[in-house]
Amino acid sequence: MKTKAGFVALIGKPNAGKSTLLNTLLNAHLALVSHKANATRKLMKCIVPFKDKEGYESQIIFLDTPGLHHQEKLLNQCMLSQALKAMGDAELRVFLASVHDDLKGYEEFLSLCQKPHILALSKIDTATHKQVLQKLQEYQKYSSQFLALVPLSAKKSQNLNALLECISKHLSPSAWLFEKDLMSDEKMRDIYKEIIRESLFDFLSDEIPYESDVMIDKFIEEERIDKVYARIIVEKESQKKIVIGKNGVNIKRIGTNARLKMQEVGEKKVFLNLQVIAQKSWSKEEKSLQKLGYIYQRNRD
């Protein structure tokens, strides 16, 4: 069997649709999806097998990165550092841009990275045929910069094989780097953490600011059930009250939603104990970011 394998950094501005694309390619719910900008905070490896037209069985290891942005907050700088490191380490890069975005995001990417990359135009199902053609034409002035320009829709599964075919074409022949049926090398506790964050954003994205997170205090993995003890962290007591809700209605909804998603991903029952704490300025404190894994992620090789 002819095989290829390689790491592919998935880059883009916040809300370009990176996590939606990966979940569609995996046919599973691993990457956090939210309409809230910068929902993805940590780099995640997602493994997609693909057989290309040349007969190669390719193992494409996507690096799902935080959205490219420039803000002075320590948390934002940690996230940007992860994205830049992924761009440098990967064999190939895919820049994902929404059909509704101007070209500034791509131009910023070009200023940061001069390495081989594919430009993918996402969310084409939300635009007219004329709008898509116009946007493709706008990007043509940079045709010498990218290997290929692929319009697609993750939500409608349009043109995804074309993207994978293009990626596989530019990977080097190699033995597979991970086991055949593995979708991610993430630990289950980290996936569960992201699911809780997603549920928080699902129900309270307009009420709860960007400075909220989840910490898994204890994770007990048994044959038939996973037991998860977690805390939602916000910065103000007023935010804590919103998350809990009157008579605990909000935290119950968040917990139930998260638990059902966790059971689907883990393929077993899940017991979830969910608490809420207020910790002032946690997103600006290095010690807090270390506990949550952001600075460790940023500094490790």
Curated annotation (Swiss-Prot):
GO terms under cellular component: cytosol; plasma membrane
Molecular function as annotated in GO: GTP binding; GTPase activity; ribosomal small subunit binding; small ribosomal subunit rRNA binding
A Pfam family that the UniProt record links to this protein: MMR_HSR1
Residue ranges of the region described as G1: 12-19
Keywords: Cell inner membrane, Cell membrane, Cytoplasm, GTP-binding, Membrane, Nucleotide-binding, Ribosome biogenesis, RNA-binding, rRNA-binding
Domain of life: Bacteria
Annotated spans, G3: 64-67
Topological relation to the membrane, as annotated: Peripheral membrane protein
Region (G2): 38-42
Primary localisation category: cytoplasm
Disulfide bonds: none
Domain Era-type G intervals: 4-173
The KH type-2 domain, residue ranges: 204-280
PROSITE patterns assigned: G_ERA, KH_TYPE_2
Annotated localization: Cytoplasm; Cell inner membrane
GO biological process: ribosomal small subunit assembly
Family as reported in the entry's similarity comment: Belongs to the TRAFAC class TrmE-Era-EngA-EngB-Septin-like GTPase superfamily. Era GTPase family.
Matching NCBIfam families: era (TIGR00436), PRK00089.1 (NF000908), small_GTP (TIGR00231)
PANTHER family: GTPASE ERA, GTPASE ERA, MITOCHONDRIAL
Task of the protein: An essential GTPase that binds both GDP and GTP, with rapid nucleotide exchange. Plays a role in 16S rRNA processing and 30S ribosomal subunit biogenesis and possibly also in cell cycle regulation and energy metabolism.
Record's protein name: GTPase Era
Natural source organism: Helicobacter pylori (strain J99 / ATCC 700824)
GN (gene name): era
